């Protein structure tokens, strides 16, 4: 149904059409809602949740603006943490207070929350504010929000509502619901610029929290390279599965597979115990002190790590050979090993193999899987493609995600736009057609969605392209020429570890290059920005480049990367006043944050200031609303002519 048919069916009379025109044109003049951008969460749920709850520092800023000099810094901090973590903070209040002190706390807190809610709701319609409220408290909250308690006629009415909430033991529930409403209104829309998944312990909880938040369609995702592994695994790609399991073993994170998604690893564990011994190159990285393991567990993970790595290297061979268009023959590493596995020749240089584990590799046919290995990978494909929870989460990533997004003048993408040294777009030639720039992204996304829709097809081009997205030389999500996984396991010479970043990463400092990219994606080069994730911003490196047109917001949630960055990463806020880059210090733990009121210390840097406040009319939604207004005015004219 086209827009005209849809609107004329919904609004059939002159008064109805006129009312909707008045409503829409009023909305167009409201201030632009606040967007927040974050990326590279890497499964760090608690740090992600803290940023989500505090709105990238925006909640505290709202409190400060609302109450100005009425609160001490300590009082402001306590109130902010109530808004962030209402249930946990109220439990602490109940331990600390009782009787009249608790009653007074309730009365004071109710008044403060109503004031803050009113302050955060000023740039939204009543309808939108209502949708952000908990349904069970809509009536009560609206009565408190839109009534003047200082009017004598309503004063008793106002306070009776509050007293009854306390007497009927609904005060805690109302406070929690109102705090969550304030969180939702403080940031209207969240953009996740890739990599929900990776080495962190709880990517599933990150997805669940996004699903909960999305009841107002307020979340979008631009897939990252690690996300693609999980989407590919759910789609039945054996290579994506092997990579994913290997990374989980490497970072002592197999529990996410077994305990969360119900993936059966028994066949893999038996194979690993049969063929592999201890090996320092495959011992799990113990980057998290909260997940200690026994020596027996460490040995088992080390064996599993080797077994799945060998399966991965074997699976790569047939795909590379049947896809010459991928131009990845240089990654056929197993056939470059000496027959005794003591050395390997790569790019004209011979390297000594250290910590080798090639018991299942036949030098005469190095990519052939043993029957036991084939049984393992078949079992894993079966588990991944039939995990209900995994598919529910991947469905959400597919429904709300894309390879890139054009949103309110800006281009959001996780990795890069592949180019050569001169800045010319490069890509892939498939069946005689060369795809570069925006066409490359569109082609890869179309194939990803095709592969996901047919999980029983696992040797087709669409499925192979999912693996290419993870590791291919011209993959927009990888951004390097080589993924030197094999070399890092078995060769100590750092020369062999070089992966070669795409020239995009040094060219993106040039304003003209960024304008070229914006034009390629049909955005205004003069006012648009590229918002990028994927690469941690090293100490001393500026995340704002190209005369403020390129903004790198790797979230820095992953603790190992914080050694490189020195901070907890960046998020970006874009509101009616302009853009601000928010720098976060590393997050400790949720328990520490709540017990000690330890916020992530954030500093803000203005990226761009609007000459005047931007309105809804200057957003993508505003363009849609203006189209609706034009159609309604046309229909209004038609009805008046018929009178």
From Swiss-Prot:
EC numbers: 3.1.3.11
Catalytic activity from the UniProt record: beta-D-fructose 1,6-bisphosphate + H2O = beta-D-fructose 6-phosphate + phosphate
Coiled-coil ranges per UniProt: none
GO biological process: gluconeogenesis
Pfam family, one: FBPase_2
The keyword Zinc belongs to this UniProt entry's keyword annotation: no
Family statement drawn from the similarity comment of this UniProt entry: Belongs to the FBPase class 3 family.
Identification of the protein by name: Fructose-1,6-bisphosphatase class 3
Source lineage: Bacteria, Bacillati, Bacillota, Bacilli, Lactobacillales
Gene from which the chain derives: fbp
